[in-house]
Amino acid sequence: MILKSKICGVSDTKILNFIVNHDHPPQFIGFIVNYPKSKRHVDIKILKELMKIEKKNSFYVAVLVNPNQNILEEIKEMPFDYYQLYDCQPSKIQSIKEKYKKKIITAITVRDIKDVNDYRKFIETTDIYLFDSKGYENSMSFD
């Protein structure tokens, strides 16, 4: 198994510069694009500034909760390598993947072990799976 690391919720240029210039940066750096309930949500104006920072050896990830066409169009020219999608059906994910030519991280919300098996629905559309707890903005744990 190949393990990858991701830091998510980056919203400050100073912190992002530190991360990308670290001797051992994470493979993925996530930016919460369209979920204002999260205290780590990044306003689009700040996001544009963050995207000016060279990612070097990391991949930039747009974290999106059931994104609408407006937000997808607004970020399409930004240098994201992956879109991490929450609360999307496989058909919507496939459509986003084809239209925007991005790799996809499908986030599967886990309440219990049955939810883990949901990954099977996304086999055709997903490049990476991320299993996350319910309550995105609350950083809740799960068994």
Predicted regions and their residues:
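Conserved N-terminal beta1-alpha1 strand-loop-helix module at the mouth
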Residues: M1-F142
